[in-house]
From Swiss-Prot:
Species the sequence originates in: Homo sapiens (Human)
Localization terms from the record: Cytoplasm
Source organism phylogeny: Eukaryota, Metazoa, Chordata, Craniata, Vertebrata
KH domain residues: 17-67, 101-154, 241-293
Record-linked PANTHER family: KH DOMAIN CONTAINING RNA BINDING PROTEIN
Function in brief: Single-stranded nucleic acid binding protein that binds preferentially to oligo dC.
Predominant cellular place of this UniProt entry's protein: cytoplasm
An annotated Gene Ontology molecular function: DNA binding
Organism domain of life: Eukaryota
One Gene Ontology biological process: regulation of mRNA stability
One GO cellular component term: ribonucleoprotein complex
Descriptive protein name: Poly(rC)-binding protein 4
Length: 403
């Protein structure tokens, strides 16, 4: 890779560990990974930085670079020159058309962006002038997170200098409060509550019109930190706490937990429910998953867990693998309908958007297509146990039907 070290200057290395997250499109990710992973392997070896790329089939992926400041800047330098190399190799549409600049999109906690912009924009203006790179801080939060995208574009040397200065600012100004990281695979669906149909989740590929999808995407760009389900009109989660228990096969529990607990943590944040996964008993083929919270929290958590299980089964062709799966939970067309709503919630139909659960504006009511008579062939039914008020457990068979 010619010129991959061109933007680096010798600096005393700080004794800290720096983590830099970048948002990349699929084509950029493919370029960084290279054939059989050769490019990313070379970047790791030459920079000594730890580089991970998020899994998933969505158009965007998160590339995380961790290491000493020198290692991270070296890796960013090699990535910038690799992307520049790709732009040079791309065929030009016309002889007089200049090729676009190299662009990196950094993902930074919103609480640190104020320091990056500076009073009346003085800091970001200084960075632009001293580095020659274009820097743009997004006005909106990334969907379902407390992070913003910071776009840096220009020639590789200018980008490297700019990233150095940005990192210096964020190291001097640690994030305030908890940070909800951006996950590109996370999108919004719509939860519907009706007296006759109970809880259901409407994915954005179901009966939602294109206009409603557009509005939902616009709302998602104004996401705020996760809120409790108490924002739903007419519901008081504090007075209707209950628990529900699932039995999940051992070979599918991995897709519910996720890598280093990322998936179960995401489900807890999205639903507001407390979720406990029991230890594996000797000789048992299933694990107990207990969900505790308000009826709305339980229903939403149950849907998200069921979506993980059905996605894992469909991905493996119906035959569970021996290794735990680490799968994203996209809100694709829902495969299941959730349990009947509690008696206290029945009555006038409500429309509760998933954005409402995390503090956004409610969506208009969406009509729910009638359910088909039964589940499709091969769709497993899960046994759930609801804890009664007197402490006894009543087992009931829950069969799920598609819309």
């Amino acid at each position: 890779m010619s010129g991959s070290d061109g933007g680096l200057e010798e600096e005393p290395e700080l004794s800290i560990t720096l983590t830099l997250r970048m948002l990349m499109h699929g084509k950029e990710v493919g370029s960084i990974i290279g054939k059989k992973g050769e490019t990313v392997k070379r970047i790791r070896e030459q920079s000594s930085a730890r580089i991970t790329i998020s899994e998933g089939s969505c158009p965007e992926r998160i590339t995380t670079i961790t290491g000493s400041t020198a290692a991270v800047f070296h890796a960013v330098s090699m990535i910038a020159f690799k992307l520049d190399e790709d732009l040079c190799a791309a065929p030009a549409n016309g002889g007089n058309v200049s090729r676009p600049p190299v662009t990196l999109r950094l993902v930074i906690p919103a609480s640190q962006c104020g320091s990056l912009i500076g009073k009346a924009g003085t800091k970001i203006k200084e960075i632009r002038e001293t580095t020659g790179a274009q820097v743009q801080v997004a006005g909106d939060l990334l969907p379902n997170s407390t992070e913003r995208a910071v776009t840096v574009s220009g020639v590789p040397d200018a980008i490297i200098l700019c990233v150095r200065q940005i990192c210096a600012v964020i190291l001097e100004s640690p994030p305030k409060g908890a940070t909800i990281p951006y996950h590109p695979s996370l999108s919004l669906g719509t939860v519907l509550l009706s007296a006759n149909q109970g809880f259901s989740v409407q994915g954005q590929y179901g009966a939602v019109t294109p206009a409603e999808v557009t509005k939902l995407q616009q709302l998602s760009s104004h996401a705020v930190p996760f809120a409790t389900p108490s924002v739903v009109p007419g519901l008081d989660p504090g007075t209707q706490t209950s628990s529900q228990e699932f039995l999940v096969p051992n070979d599918l529990i991995g897709c519910v937990i996720g890598r280093q607990g990322s998936k179960i943590s995401e489900i807890r944040q999205m639903s507001g429910a407390h979720i406990k996964i029991g230890n594996q008993a000797e000789g048992a083929g299933e694990r107990h998953v207990t969900i505790t919270g308000s009826p709305v929290s339980i229903a939403l958590a149950q849907y998200l867990i069921t979506a993980c299980l059905e996605t894992a089964k469909s991905t493996s062709g119906g035959t569970p693998s021996s290794a735990p799966a680490d799968l994203p939970a996209p809100f694709s067309p829902p495969l299941t309908a959730l349990p009947t709503a509690p008696p206290g919630l029945l009555g006038t139909p409500y429309a509760i958007s998933l954005s409402n659960f995390i503090g956004l504006k409610p969506m208009p009511f969406l009509a729910l297509p009638p359910a088909s008579p039964g589940p499709p062939p091969g769709l497993a039914a899960y046994t759930a146990k609801m804890a009664a008020a007197n402490g006894s457990k009543k087992a009931e068979r829950q069969k799920f039907s598609p819309y």
